[in-house]
Amino acid sequence: HLGAMSTREGSPLRVNVGAASADALREFGESVGWEAERRARLADLLDVAEPLAHHFVLAFDLAEGPQPRVGLECYMASAPGYGDHWRLFLARLTDAGLCSEAEAGALLEWPGRTAGAKGRGRLTGHARLADFLGTRHPGAILRTLNHVKLVSAPGEPRRAKAYLVATRGWLDLTP
């Protein structure tokens, strides 16, 4: 997909290219004529992520041609708490110097749920639905780790950024 990055210098166009394999992204870089240095930086990010990520999104900006920064969004096959994918991936990022053990630990603590509190006053749509569904289907805020983006730019250290999600959901407590 495409996005207008109007708040960034030069107002570049962000291009996101999804792929189920690292090889597909390597081939993409070659097929669009990226120079060897940019392909090498992409390969470096893929080498970190490939063994554990389920699928990828390559992100780069276009202004008057491709901008130097390359981003690689890494998605896991399962949510944290339902396997070791995220724990292993974050350990790999720690080993690669892309995050600290404390940062990885904090990210692993994020997933979960927070049961909604019954408020006073006028009921919102969510509160009315919770009342209708009853105690076996309480509302909650569901938290998960969506993806981690690895970023590489010439002359800068590689970086990792985490993208968190918090959504309103309904729990099923029926026996």
What is the meaning of each model-derived region?
Residues 22-175:
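C-terminal structured domains
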